[in-house]
Swiss-Prot record:
Name this protein carries in UniProt: Protoheme IX farnesyltransferase
Cross-referenced InterPro entries: Protohaem_IX_farnesylTrfase, UbiA_prenyltransferase, UbiA_sf
Transmembrane segment boundaries: 9-29, 40-60, 89-109, 110-130, 134-154, 155-175, 190-209, 228-248, 269-289
The UniProt record lists the keyword Ligase: no
Organism from which the protein derives: Frankia casuarinae (strain DSM 45818 / CECT 9043 / HFP020203 / CcI3)
């Protein structure tokens, strides 16, 4: 693969996309109460990857000025000039259009509209509107990362059900503690770039208290899924177990911050990925039993 081709792939941030798509297939299975057709799953995943890649690519285009100031992002293709800004913007728009067409003609148009809404929300509301203006950027803007749940449900049913809305809420409340843990680690990067992430503008005690609050909201939403989606005992036991695990770790981070110790936020960051994966695996299992 040429350097430019690798640059285009890097712009899509496929490692982030993987995390988003972890939620999609289990939700499709829950909506189907079984395994949907492999064709539908494949098209939904490909189109979803292109939609998320489109949003990420355009985000890189907009943020190329601050990416060069941050150690975590200074090796991105636009900073290293592997891909030109015009090429990146064109690529982002084109794969977004391809995503829309795949969803519209091979899945359904409600899913296409949801994918377009996710791209627009991430680019215009988060990247252009909130990211450099308010510490609430990731709280509101993080909603873009919840759309795969709605898209997965819509791909199977053509509508958005209450179970999908509650799972959207789970991911929505999961996002702040997940992302703020990372932002605590790279606080100096965000400060140097002038991005007012909460860990930049608030004390570590304030940040960890808010993370804990969102963790409780996330667990509450995950438990509410059980009666609404009629998931049965397998999901409920899993939601209680992994939810308790997440809350214990969130309390540990808050307690260490309160005592003036290093909260070691990356431990919670990595654990949050495991939490989300296990919760949605439980949803997939529920759909099969």
């Amino acid at each position: 693969m040429s350097a430019k081709a690798r640059g285009y792939v890097a712009l899509m941030k496929l490692r982030v996309v993987e995390l988003l798509l972890i939620t999609t297939v289990p939700v499709m299975m829950l909506a189907e109460r079984g395994v949907p057709s492999l064709r539908l799953i494949a098209v939904t995943l490909v189109a979803g990857t292109l939609a998320a890649g489109s949003a990420n690519t355009i985000n890189c285009y907009v943020d190329r000025d601050i990416d060069q100031m941050m150690g975590r992002t200074k090796r991105r293709p636009l900073v290293r000039a592997t891909v030109t800004p015009t090429e990146a913007l064109t690529f982002g728009i084109v794969i977004g259009i391809v995503s829309t067409l795949l969803f519209g003609f091979l899945v359904n148009w409600p899913s296409a509209l949801l994918a377009d809404g996710a791209i627009a929300f991430y680019v215009f509301v988060y990247t252009l509107g909130l990211k450099r203006r308010t510490p609430s950027n990731i709280v509101i803007g993080g909603a873009a990362g919840c759309f795969p749940v709605l898209i997965g449900w819509s791909a199977v049913t053509g509508t958005v059900g209450w179970a999908a809305v509650l799972l959207f809420a789970v991911v929505f409340f999961w996002t702040p503690p997940h992302f703020w843990a990372l932002a605590m680690k790279f606080r100096d990067d965000y400060a140097a770039a002038g991005v007012p992430m909460l860990p930049v503008v608030a004390s570590v005690q304030v940040v960890t208290r808010r993370m804990l609050g969102y963790a409780y909201a996330m667990v509450a939403a995950s438990l509410a899924v059980a009666p609404v989606a009629s998931t049965g005992p397998v999901y409920l036991v899993a939601a209680v177990a992994v939810g308790a695990w997440f809350l214990v770790e969130s309390h540990r981070v808050a307690r260490r911050a309160r005592h003036g110790e290093d909260p070691r936020p990356m431990r919670l960051f990595h654990m949050s990925i495991t939490y989300l994966t296990l919760l949605f695996v439980a949803i997939a299992v529920t759909a099969l039993v």
